[in-house]
Structures are given as C-alpha cells and as structure tokens.
C-alpha cells in the first residue's frame, strides 16, 4: 500500500499539469515522496483512452477511489468505480454525495470563486481526505454491493428511457404547441420512434 497509483481522466491529473491542475512531478518532489513510490499513468495511453476492461481491472483492484475534487460536475469515474463495487472518497460538493452510498466517504472543503468559470468551486479538506484514506485502509479489502446497485440506476439506456425520452417528448409537444405561426410544427412521434420529426 506504499505505492500510490494515479489514474485520471482530466487535466487535474496530468503529470505536468494543465489548466487549473498542477505539476504532479514537482508536487511529489516538494512532498519528498521517494522515487519509485509514485507511479503515473502512461501519458500517451491516458490521452488516447485506457480500454474499458483495463479500467474495470484498475477499479476492481483498488480498495477505494479517491475522487475528492474542486468542481467535478457529475463524476462519471465515481460511477465507473461503483459499477466495480469499489467505494469512493468524494467531495461534499456538486452532485458527488449523490453518487456514493453510506460505505463510501464524503469530505468537506473550502469554497472559492473560480472567475474563469464564473462559479464557486471547493478545495477539498486534505485532513479529511487523509482520515478517509486511513479509514479505508483500516477497513481492508472491501467490495460494495450497495455502490454497484446505485451505479446500475445510472445505466445509460435506463436513464434515457426513464428520464430523457419523456423530457424530450414533452419538449417536442411544447414546441408543437408554441411554434410561431407560419412555421412548420414538429410532428409528435410514437414513444419508441424517433424523438422529433419535422
């Protein structure tokens, strides 16, 4: 467990840092982490996508996913890990708490204004992250059936059928009812057909 493996899908985990991320090589040196104790994802593979089966193996091999973020919107990686029964450590910010069950960990943080995005972000509390990591370590190897059940609720086909299709049908009906005069009105379609026919 002395080896830290960083696997990421955004600029905050780029080896040399981009955007609001930071240079992880310099950061590791500042923390005096010995060489060989920190491993980075192959940066070429990282940019060209890690195959799904490899990601599933990484999630399954992990005791916990550390995904405390400053401003992650939805957090697909949390659900990917959940689908592999891997609990997560997430920020008490955005929708992240909705993506974990009671056997995962939620950490607080300090809000700050990100003027580039014109929105508040949150800097995760490092002490709480350490506490969560230590709790996960103390718990030992653990698989979360609850996390998997939660992830299945976000299945793309299910979400589309139960949420998106009805919303798009309502939007189509609204557009048909409120189309300006002289413009072609959309024709409603059956529930299993295309969403909009003009």
Features from the language model and the residues they span:
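Nucleotide-activated donor-binding/catalytic signature segment of Leloir-type glycosyltransferases, i.e.
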Residues: 18-57
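Short alpha-helical segment that forms part of, or immediately flanks, the ligand-binding pocket
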Residues: 55-56, 79-83, 94-98
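A short alpha->beta transition loop at the rim of the catalytic pocket in nucleotide-sugar-dependent
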Residues: 63, 85, 92
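Aromatic "clamp/platform" in nucleotide-sugar-dependent glycosyltransferases that forms part
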Residues: 70
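Short hydrophobic beta-strand element within catalytic cores of glycosyltransferases
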Residues: 78, 87-90, 104-106
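A charged, aromatic-enriched C-terminal amphipathic alpha-helix characteristic of glycosyltransferases
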Residues: 124, 128, 138-167
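C-terminal alpha-helical cap of glycosyltransferases
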Residues: 135-139, 157-188
